[in-house]
Amino acid sequence: PPPPPFFFHPYAGIRDAQESRGLGDVYKRQALVMLILLLAFFAVSQLKKFENLVFLLVIVVYSAINIYFYIYHGLVFSLSYPLVACFLSMITINLYLFMLERKQKTFIRGAFSQYLSPAVIDMIVKDPDKLKLGGERREMTAFFSDIQGFSTVSESLTPEELVQLLNEYLTSMCEVISSYNGTVDKFEGDAIIAFWGAPLDNPDHARDGCMAALDMQERNIELRKKLREENRPMLYTRMGINSGPIVVGNMGSATKTDYTMMGDNVNLAARLEGANKFYKTYTMIAENTYKLAEDSIDVRYLDVVRVVGKNEPVKIYQLLAKKNQLAGSMQEVLEHYEKGMNCYKNLKFKDAIMNFENALKLEPEDGPCLTYVNRCKMYLDQPPPKDWDGVFNFTEKG
């Protein structure tokens, strides 16, 4: 028989209280779910990792299944423990990835801090995918420099004085290279080897290399004033620059590697640095570099040469100044020089000498003019062959 009426209402009250408490627990769980979801969204927005999206998807699907069973079947599953466990797993994985990324950034800063500008390092740290440590072929500009007569300079100084002078010089030069986002490859005694266009792409690599070379020569002028006042030896730097396809990357043994470059275009830059002595110049660039940077620089055409180790002739230029910034009487010197070069190419060596000497009246120490006066005199005594192509063959590296 049904329970007496006076028993029904207490039973109904107990049942209503239980259902109300159950619904309250559900609401608490739903609030917890929302909190977890908000935290998950925050993690995704901050870390932007694919793994976080997977965790978020798991949380959403699990919550949707629970809501479905509660609405249509009256079943309530525990949301708190699985979702908290899922979220803790996500935090653990992200902490691991964070530590891994931090280790990678520390490696990048340690590996490149000595020869990359801080701005370039920051770019690589923000996007390590831009850095390829394996060998790759890039369009780049290679730079070589060497101090003229450094052996004589070193013999006049004590070891301590020599190291102090060299450190002062190298620091000043490398500051300029870094300011133009160049990469210092290595030092070989007093020589500096650097490049532009790696590890990050730089469409203006030739221009930046030329601008850096010009500023480095300006720094040398300032340094020589200081050295003269301190009664220390003067330093004059020869530089060679060439652009083109170059192989660059981490090279070496299994235990010791360097981020460096190699290739024919690198070798040509080294040859041009040494070739300065034949023209009594200090900064020489190849035709490839000139074509890429001609809108930003003033140059003097020097010669068509065949350097040691290369069969193809190369046009070479003296890098003089930034565009429209020629100093003193150089513009007038160049006018006489160009007339002399036209005579030289047409085998009119006497007329060529006259024009070169007119230039020397303005700049008595002009290296290329002195070089061509001597060469024209040589050809007057020993004329070139009838099939002469105008190419001058170097018989030594310089």
Model-derived regions, located:
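Transmembrane alpha-helices and their extracellular/periplasmic helix-loop junctions
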Residues: 25-115
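Cytosolic regulatory/linker segments at or just downstream of nucleotide-handling modules
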Residues: 246-248, 277-346, 357-358, 363-368, ...
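Intrinsically disordered, low-complexity, charge-biased linker/tail regions
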Residues: 385-398
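Alpha-helical scaffold within the catalytic cores of cyclic-nucleotide enzymes
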Residues: 166-182, 198-239, 243, 264-277, ...
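Short, small-residue-biased leader/transition segments that mark boundaries at the very start
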Residues: 2, 11-27
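Membrane-proximal helical linkers
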Residues: 102-134
